[in-house]
Amino acid sequence: MAKKLVAVVKLAIQAGKATPAPPIGPALGQHGVNIMAFCKEYNAKTADQAGMVVPVEISIFEDRSFTFVLKTPPASVLIKKALGIESGSSEPHKTKVGSLTRAQLRQIAEQKLPDLNAHDVEAAMKIIAGTARSMGVTVVD
């Protein structure tokens, strides 16, 4: 018989830097999960993505066991990494902080495609372009 699902916890954690400190400790502790076991597994699976924020969806079962699914990093983080900037513009439609080429946009869209609500790369590119615009980043051909 399948295990009974008790909770699904979604967190965005730095890759390879999960510790039992907040926000991870309290989020998992209230469900009785072994926090250190999660941290070790998460850090092992995300060691190759150092410096990125990797969202994770943790399914917690009745017997206090858990499974987790890693998602792709947020589009804004990928855009900032591609441009080498710290943050987006504080006034996105007035002050521009950089420009993204079509090739960079396609690369980010292909990386995000599994987690986006899009069926092809073109639609994913439009979604990423919208995120870029709201960050004060222009998209150039």
From Swiss-Prot:
Mind telling me which InterPro entries this protein's record contains? Ribosomal_uL11, Ribosomal_uL11_bac-typ, Ribosomal_uL11_C, Ribosomal_uL11_C_sf, Ribosomal_uL11_CS, Ribosomal_uL11_N, Ribosomal_uL11_N_sf
Q: Kindly state which keywords UniProt assigns to this record, in alphabetical order.
A: Methylation, Ribonucleoprotein, Ribosomal protein, RNA-binding, rRNA-binding
Glycoprotein listed as a keyword: no
List, in alphabetical order, the Gene Ontology terms for molecular function in this entry.
Answer: large ribosomal subunit rRNA binding; structural constituent of ribosome
Under Gene3D superfamilies, the record lists: Ribosomal protein L11, C-terminal domain, Ribosomal protein L11/L12, N-terminal domain
Q: Name one GO biological process term.
A: translation
What does UniProt give as GO cellular component?
A: cytosolic large ribosomal subunit
Report what the Swiss-Prot or TrEMBL entry states about this protein's PTMs: One or more lysine residues are methylated.
Q: Which SMART domains match?
A: RL11 (SM00649)
Q: Quote the function comment for this protein.
A: Forms part of the ribosomal stalk which helps the ribosome interact with GTP-bound translation factors.
Report the family membership: Belongs to the universal ribosomal protein uL11 family.
Q: How does it assemble?
A: Part of the ribosomal stalk of the 50S ribosomal subunit. Interacts with L10 and the large rRNA to form the base of the stalk. L10 forms an elongated spine to which L12 dimers bind in a sequential fashion forming a multimeric L10(L12)X complex.
Q: What is this protein called?
A: Large ribosomal subunit protein uL11
This chain is encoded by the gene named rplK
